[in-house]
Amino acid sequence: MKKIRILNKTFFTVLCLLFFSFSYSQQAKKEEIPLLHGAHHIGKRMDADMVRWRGYGLGQFIHWGVYSILGGDYNGKHYSDVGGAAEWIRSWKEVPHSVYDSLYKKFDPKAFNPKQWAAMAKQMGVKYVTFTTKHHDGFCMWPSKYTNYSVANTPYKKDIVKQVVDAYNAEGIDVYLYFSIMDWHNPDWRYDLKTKEDTIAFDRFKLFTKNQLTELLKNYPAIKGLWFDGTWDNSWKKSGAFSDSLDQYLKAIHPGLIIGSRLRADDFGNRHFDANHELMGDYEQGWERKIPKTFAETNGNDWDCVMTIPENGWGYAKKWLGHWKTTNELLEMLAQCVSLDGNFVINFGPGADGTFRPEEIKNAKEIGDWMKVNNTAIYNCEYAAWEKQDWGYYTKKTGENKVYMIVFNVPVSGSLKIKPSKKLEVDKAYLLTDPNKPLTMEKLDYGASFIHLPNAFKANKPFVIVLETKETNQNNEGPKAKT
């Protein structure tokens, strides 16, 4: 009888645990917060425009405006000495606003050649570019009819945005337009809405913003998307209903338009992700000058990483202080991003005359030389779901059976370990540059293999190994040792 009682107690305990587990799961479901202005679709967009975006791999960012005239310096002082970025120099206490706001009268980039810019990007292997139409200072690089603070009133006068769009499109590069919501030049801009007067002024500002964005989409119908910035202040976070309606309006007048997660705020002022942790945008834009370490960190969302070449600063600075990234560093970041289902976007900051720095030109040329040989491991590639190894990164060609090893660190032994995902085995391995010479593979007893490089093989830059795979009915992990 005692044994039966114990069994009954155990059975009762299990029933209780199941009941409470079910109750908790039901409660968790009920805890979803009702939102009027949260995410409107869950999961990835699968239309042709977004599929194209997903396959880009490599992009270019260009920060250019009147801040390039100062180049991060004023009266012999470097804004970078106090941690400032060149494109933010108007906010520095050393620079009088009256001085900064008159810089446009000197903006005359005689050396600006958009066709040369686009040709450099094409050689680099860039598939899309994001160009700053208006940064936080409010200066417009197109002749906007809603403000006098634009390129139309500079000595240069010509529409820079149009020239960039036309030149890059002519090279087959898709164009996205950066637009700062924050606008220091507009008297109706507010950081917060503390009074009725603030709200009235900001309502005017919201209309101004909508008008300018409408103007951009009407003027440049070939663009593929908008890249927003300056949306972190309370004034915008309290405007979730407006940002939601703006997002829907822009997509209605420009079908297929791609907008990331920086534009909107939800009912509670959350940005990027709503109160239910769902992405509010077509892709995640939280990866600024940082890259996720694991695929799990991306939450399965589309995403890209935007990266500067110097350690801080997007606009032109006369002096790059400290470390700036080498080509191999940038290539490794590119490979890491693509291996985790993301795109990688490298920023360039031309000077006031419209030319790039020698360091930027060198990086672009060297990246392009590498991409010319190895781009098949970057374009239209995705997360391979193979166990990460120390030699570098895996990418997988979308819809194919090929997996690419982008190798940055060759072990002293010259042998590279791989471990395919379950139910998959490697049929053949070879260097991308020498497909007719298979590499020797040595299978191990726990589902892994070594790929042996030829003794004579030497590499002074990252290289790619192609793995042709096939499905197998056997579990490739092999028998586990008894311990």
Where are these regions (language model features)?
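Mature catalytic domains of secreted/periplasmic carbohydrate-active enzymes
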Residues: 27-483
